[in-house]
Regions:
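Residue-level signal for inorganic ion chemistry
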Residues: 8, 65, 83, 112, ...
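Conserved core of the sugar-phosphate nucleotidyltransferase
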Residues: 88-181
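N-terminal glycine-rich phosphate-binding loop and ensuing alpha1 helix
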Residues: 1-35
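Hydrophobic helical membrane-anchoring modules
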Residues: 187-198
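Short phosphate-binding loop-to-helix
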Residues: 41-77
Length: 198
C-alpha cells in the first residue's frame, strides 16, 4: 500500500480518470480476482469491466486479457497494455499512446537511453558498446487495435513463440515494426521497496 491504497489502485485511477478510456481489464492470479473486484468497488473504479486469471507467463497473461476484450469490443478499438506496477503513468503518456496508435497502428511508450550501454557475453567484461542515440528504453502502456494484437498472439502461438517478455518484443519477434510514443522518467516500474520511496 502507498498512501493507504494498493499500488494497483493508483495505477487504475490514472486510467479511470482519463476521458478516452472506456473500460479496463485486469489480469491477475486466480486467488486475487475477488480481492481486486472488492478493491475496485471500495475505490470507485467504475471502468473495471473484466478481471481474468493470468497465465504461466507474461505473454500468456496478456493474451488472456486481450482475448477477453475481443469478446466484448470492436476489433478497431484500441487497447493499452500496461504494467500494474507503473502507478505514475500520466494522462499525457496515455493520450500520446492513444494518438500514435490511431495514427500508426501501434504505439510503444519509450524514453531516451541516457546511460552508456555495454555489451558483454559473460557478464564480467565488455565486448563493445551500443550508441545510445540509437536506443530507446521501453515502458508501458503499449497500444494496439484489439483485432491486431489478438491476431498477433494467434500467429505467435502457431510460430511456437510462447514466452516473449513484452508486447513490443513479440511484435519484433513476429517481424513487425513498432512506433514510439512519449514516456517519462517518472513512469517507473516499482520492482523493489526502494522504488516506493521515489
Amino acid at each position: 500500500h502507498v498512501e493507504n491504497k494498493p499500488i494497483i489502485i493508483h495505477t487504475m485511477e490514472a486510467f479511470q480518470n482519463h476521458p478516452s478510456v472506456d473500460a479496463m481489464v485486469v489480469v491477475t492470479l486466480p486467488a486475487w480476482i475477488d480481492v481486486l473486484k472488492a478493491y475496485a468497488a471500495q475505490f470507485n473504479i467504475t471502468k473495471l469491466k473484466y478481471v481474468v486469471p493470468g497465465g504461466k507467463n507474461g505473454q500468456d497473461s496478456i493474451r488472456n486479457g486481450v482475448y477477453e476484450l475481443e469478446k466484448h469490443h470492436d476489433p478497431e478499438d484500441i487497447v493499452l497494455i500496461h504494467d500494474a506496477i507503473r502507478p505514475m503513468v500520466s494522462a499525457e503518456i496515455i493520450s500520446d499512446c492513444i494518438r500514435i496508435t490511431q495514427k500508426c497502428g501501434n504505439a510503444i511508450t519509450v524514453i531516451p537511453c541516457a546511460e552508456a550501454m555495454m555489451q558483454t557475453e559473460d557478464g564480467v567484461v565488455s565486448i563493445g558498446s551500443y550508441p545510445r542515440d540509437k536506443l530507446k528504453r521501453t515502458q508501458t502502456p503499449q497500444g494496439f487495435h484489439i483485432g491486431d494484437i489478438c491476431e498477433l498472439h494467434r500467429e505467435a502461438l502457431k510460430a511456437g513463440i510462447t514466452n516473449s517478455v513484452a508486447s513490443c518484443t513479440l511484435m519484433i519477434e513476429m517481424g513487425k515494426q513498432v512506433y514510439f510514443s512519449a514516456g517519462s522518467e517518472k513512469n517507473i516500474k516499482l520492482t523493489t521497496i526502494e522504488d516506493i520511496d521515489i
